[in-house]
Amino acid sequence: LHLCDRRQRQMCIRDSHNKTDAAKCDVKKAYPSTTVECVMNLLRRDIGKNKPLLWLVEAVMANYPDGVLLIGGYLPCWLFNYVMSYVLRYILSHRKVRRGKSSKMILAICCYADDITVYGRISNLTKVMKDTTRWAKETLGLTIKSAWDIIHFASFDAERQQNKRRKAGSHQRTPGLDMMGYVVRRTYTIIRGRNFVKLRRAILRAQRDLDALGYVPWWRAQRIMSQWGEIKHSDSRGFCQKYNIYKIIRAAKRSVSWHSKQLLLKEQAHGAVC
């Protein structure tokens, strides 16, 4: 399965100096659409000689209601990834021949669960996704939604010009890929809009608590620390300087550490009494 983190998504966009587009789509009702019969057919094809393993997997899935994968299970998660790997390999297998030379139609793929992002030229992407939608439905029983998000990434020069306009007061941005909590563009990455609004609100309230109480309540500190990774892995230096993020993060870490120690002491005291 071609999983793709933030850095890999950036590389797909930035390493290609030519015109690059992206098509983002997802599978409709991914787990309920993946049948036990489909999974077993693929497993028999790939590991047909391993009879004990086939028997075990089939016995476990025999309890699944309606004969489809369960949502939230550990085994269904990996089995769905296994089925999706066939879709991704089929997408990457598309090639075209021009002047006797064969070339790839797809530049790269990023996949997160049932969300698929395909990179390449828009003319190639349209052909590949239409063919893949038909193949996935006929072969695997999966329905890829027809409502694709098409992103036309701006060039490096267009990004620089837009950056100058933003410094002059404009609030517009160039098109970006919104996936996994980030919006990725050729020259920078930011946090998704609604996630940023929630984070900024929590930061402001934490600063107010820090000024009034001298500490950040543990429950608010946990909420902030859960989004600390989004700040670290995005271009948020101006945000950190404006709102004194590093000071608040240090206070949040102390609060979370203190709360964890209190819980540990309670567990030890309860164990001693018992």
Where are these regions (language model features)?
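Generic detector of low-complexity/intrinsically disordered segments
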Residues: 3-5, 144, 179, 265
